[in-house]
Curated annotation (Swiss-Prot):
InterPro entries cross-referenced by the UniProt entry: EF-Tu_GTPase, EFTu-like_2, GTPBP1-like, P-loop_NTPase, T_Tr_GTP-bd_dom, Transl_B-barrel_sf, Transl_elong_EF1A/Init_IF2_C
UniProt-annotated stretches for the region G4: 288-291
Region (G5) residue spans: 344-346
Single GO molecular function: GTPase activity
Keyword GTP-binding: yes
Pfam families, per the entry: GTP_EFTU, GTP_EFTU_D2
Alphabetically ordered keywords of this record: GTP-binding, Nucleotide-binding
GTP-binding keyword on record: yes
Region (G3): 232-235
Organism of derivation: Caenorhabditis elegans
Protein name per UniProt: GTP-binding protein cgp-1
Residues holding GTP: 147-154, 232-236, 288-291
Start and end residues of each stretch annotated as G1: 147-154
Amino acid sequence: MDRIQENQKKATNLCELYADGNDDDSEKEQQDRGLDAQFLLRSTPEDVEKYMIHVRKQLMEGEGECLVELGAPINSNSKNPKSGLSEEDLDKAADAQLKILEKIPAVGTKVIRRKQTGGGSLFTEVWIIRDPPTEKDFIEARVAVVGNVDAGKSTLLGVLTHSALDDGRGAARTKLFRHKHEFESGRTSSVGNDILGFDVHGNIVNKPDPHNHNLDWVQIGSDCAKLVTFIDLAGHEKYLKTTIFGMTGHMPDYTMLMIGANMGIIGTTKEHLSLALSLHVPVYLVVTKIDMCPANILEETMKNITRLVRSAKKLPILVRNMDDVVHAAVNFPSKKVCPIFQVSNVEGTNLPLLRQFLNIVPLRRQLNENDPAHFQIDDIYWVDGVGTIASGTLLSGTIRLNDILLLGPTSNGDFMPIPIKSIHRKRMPVGIVKCGQSASFALKKIPKKDVRKGMVLVDPKVKPVASMVFEAEILVLHHPTTIKPNYQAMLHIGSVRQTATLVSMGKEVLRTGDRDKVQFKFIRQPEYIRPGTKMVFREGRTKAVGTVSSVVPQESLAQQRAKQKDGRQKQYGKKSMGPKPPNGKPKEKIEKKLDALSIEQLTSAASTSTSST
């Protein structure tokens, strides 16, 4: 049984303990009562069971991890709840919590002890609680790394993932490059993936090979309880389409926007920030190269960053210590705050704070595990001896080995059944993929040319239908002139990337800042898209974002042939072998009539010739 299903069952069983006394008003009031700051010191059976239900609920919402604060009330109905315990009582509360976590079961680790402001000698402790580690299963968080060219994106990722500082000349970034021209230019041109693993207590498990500096992904995946995947995107403007595809197709949970302290907000920085905000992806900022930046330049850069963050209606939080890390991590999923880190890849300044933030920041994804499986493909590979490999993200449901899914749509809009014979997560073979996780599947007996980015693997229960035409509600972020019908642009909808024509719209023309409901039509082939999906379309300097509101289903080639066959059977009958004559008379009767006419004509012609002779 899956870990989440086990937690749900245990939480349900504990809830049933309170169901027996629903008729008693006093017990009902006690059930609705929250937990005060000292409930762990009492550890009554009722409070313990209530706390276990609370922790299990938080673990399910956080996909296996959550943050709790000892010495703070939980769901208290009091208007002025008291927080904080003495250090002696806090130690007792921590011991009591460890015993409770063994019953759940879960593993807890102390993050920080905080002194309450105005509370004298009262303290609280922040703990991170995780499900017990299991083999070949871990919490996965995806972070998109964006920013202007030369902001230090690849260098920071090299330092974080390989636990080695940079030499100031870009040695750390060379560990991540994939192509020859990237080594020569020092600039990322493709979507790169790098991982950072944490064990159940928050310790980093990345151990690069001392000879070739490569990471053993399989070993990291088996040792870690949480795995952070960095999606390294290009910063140069000419690679903007690759960056947009990485933001829409790889489904990041967070965005790390990099800004060079010596350069400030230049180039594509604002564009990348607006892209993340339009896709509703939480953003935190990392200011790099503070070791080589003069104090006055750094101060001016921070003023501009604060002004930019506030213009996006977010509260900037400059992270200076571990208390700021906890405060930023707890409030980050609400999308109302924007943490800002100042780091140096050469001296290592504030890098431990950034690592701890990545360790404890919670996930708040909308899980649809009970829905039918829907897997979007964002990359295709060919492996000798294995065949075609499709990688992507599971948006809903679960996929297990030997499941039969539908792959499509093809250029005709068809979907073909495909058995799942092999599943890998981070290069590690697994037996199941859950909603929100990325994975790779081996597609047997299918050529690589028949699979493309943007295709999906869906449950046959969905009965998927491809579409050429769809409607969307859009917002034009920038356009130099006006947009009219028949305008063409490149659309990014999830992993779908195709040019489409603007067929119709509500207004006569669209300008920068306008909103409207429009209709698009793909120019090449049908795609499988769902209402509610975020989209981005661009063409030159034109940028717009929107949401798919409805789709117009298109009949596949197989459906069209079936309809034509049914139509012929209804028109001519099931036993008809050919087309019906235009006058509607049966073929046999016409032939008999022609034969009779020919005999009469021959007889009359013969009699005429006899009389004439």
